[in-house]
Amino acid sequence: TDNTVSIAEELGCEVIQQWGEGKGAGMRQGFKKFLEVGDDELVMLDCDGTYHPEEITRLLDSIPKNGIVIGDRLHGNLQSNAMTSTNWIGNQLLTWLAVALHGKPIYDLCSGFWAFSRNAIERLQLNSMRFEIEAEMYTSCAHRNIPIAHVPITYSKRVGEAKLGSIKDGTSIARKLIIRRIF
């Protein structure tokens, strides 16, 4: 409804229609396409206006060998009212749970701004269909010894309604962290 597809095509971009519902399904499809194309690095950026594309270069420059880098909103420029107190507390709790269960340091589990090396994507084991995809990427890195770096980023207030439901999606993310610890 916002003409994104036609604008992207006019600019010469290849537009890929998502085959499944949910953020996780879309990301997995994007990873598959990336591996087919043969590039060396990939950036994942939520397109909700909260992240700043001009910071992509900083993330790409910070990817460790065969690893990933996560844009860290909580140690960066978290703009006023960009994150509700419920989401901030939930992210803190989920991030703490992730480190407690999986042992690999992470500062912002629910960040929507990541950069990946090809080797890291080839090694990720993913099956998530929804918002728990970041937790699954983290646990895959933890268990497969994929290096993780963190870069402070700017995070702005979202325009429009968020699709993330604090309690429902937070529970799903926690469940993914626990299941990945057990299996």
For each predicted feature, which ranges?
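Short, structured coil segments at secondary-structure junctions
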Residues: 10-12
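Catalytic donor-sugar/metal-binding loop of nucleotide-sugar-dependent glycosyltransferases
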Residues: 104-105, 126-129, 139-155
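C-terminal, non-catalytic tails of nucleotide-sugar-dependent glycosyltransferases
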Residues: 173-183
